[in-house]
């Protein structure tokens, strides 16, 4: 799966995913966004959880997306980002 496939799948399912898991998908970042992924790369997805979302929601969305994208997925909460990492993440971010 490449960057365009990931963007397509996330875009197609965005509305239903956001309702089901109480979040907003912001985009992908990291090696897939840059186009320098390897077989061992995971897909980094930046999200913003809504009030009422739980740790279980975060685990569930990760499992669901790993199944749908057929790859390891790293769900990163925008609120949990460390300030020193934000410039690097936002530089690579491809909005969905």
Name each model-derived stretch:
Residues 28:
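Conserved histidines in hydrophobic membrane contexts and catalytic metal-binding motifs
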């Amino acid at each position: 799966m490449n960057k365009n496939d990931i963007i397509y799948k996330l875009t197609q399912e965005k509305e239903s995913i956001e309702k089901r898991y109480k979040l907003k998908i912001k985009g992908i970042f990291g090696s897939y966004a840059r186009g320098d992924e390897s077989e061992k790369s995971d897909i980094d997805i930046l999200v913003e959880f809504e009030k009422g979302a739980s740790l279980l929601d975060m685990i569930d969305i990760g499992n669901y997306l790993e199944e749908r994208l057929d790859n390891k997925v790293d769900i990163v909460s925008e609120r949990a980002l460390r300030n020193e990492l934000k410039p690097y993440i936002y530089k690579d971010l491809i909005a969905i």
